Amino acid sequence: MAAPSGTVSDSESSNSSSDAEELERCREAAMPAWGLEQRPHVAGKPRAGAANSQLSTSQPSLRHKVNEHEQDGNELQTTPEFRAHVAKKLGALLDSFITISEAAKEPAKAKVQKVALEDDGFRLFFTSVPGGREKEESPQPRRKRQPSSSSEDSDEEWRRCREAAVSASDILQESAIHSPGTVEKEAKKKRKLKKKAKKVASVDSAVAATTPTSMATVQKQKSGELNGDQVSLGTKKKKKAKKASETSPFPPAKSATAIPAN
């Protein structure tokens, strides 16, 4: 259904005149304002834009414009509710035709996995075997250590356990060694030892000074003892001579040996 030709020509002429005015305004705005003056319009030489506008008014286009259509682009004159209803029906119809088969997916996955395992990586040499790295990296089962029945092994294990074991008392002792109280105690002990050493040195010097006098006294005592022994021997001989004279009837003859010299 086409509109009458008179209404179309009037609307096109009004649109072309408004377009020409907009072009003139844009040109005036684009001209620089400094050092240049706008040239006056020449009446004898019309512009190309004016000629084009005249041609457009004299020869209207035969194209069908949707915006100027009476039905405004909606030839069926449908409402949005009707369009939504049709879309829902079409969606349900498509869903009914589409079927999902789960059994067909499983073999496809298995094939993809097999292909991936076979084509995994690349061969560096012609002798290299694909998948050899995975076999090497597979963890080997560890063998359990058999308990040793010998006494030497048990003694060694017990000794290692003792070396590795740390008791709470050991930790406390180590912490006490580095504490400030222990440092003060050690300093006091060192002072006492120094005092004792000084006392011993003074005693030794005193003993060294008194040794010559003590040696002299000891020598005197020894000489006195020797003299006393000699006197005791002379007295014993005198007593024996007296007893012999008393027992014998004849008077003893005087001899030099009988009378000891004092």
Swiss-Prot record:
Disulfide bond positions: none
Name of the molecule in the record: Protein CUSTOS
Cellular localisation: Nucleus envelope
UniProtKB keywords: Developmental protein, Nucleus, Phosphoprotein, Wnt signaling pathway
Keyword rRNA-binding applies: no
Modified-residue entries (Phosphoserine), positions: S61, S138
UniProt short sequence motif Nucleolar localization signal (NLS), positions renumbered to this chain: 236-241
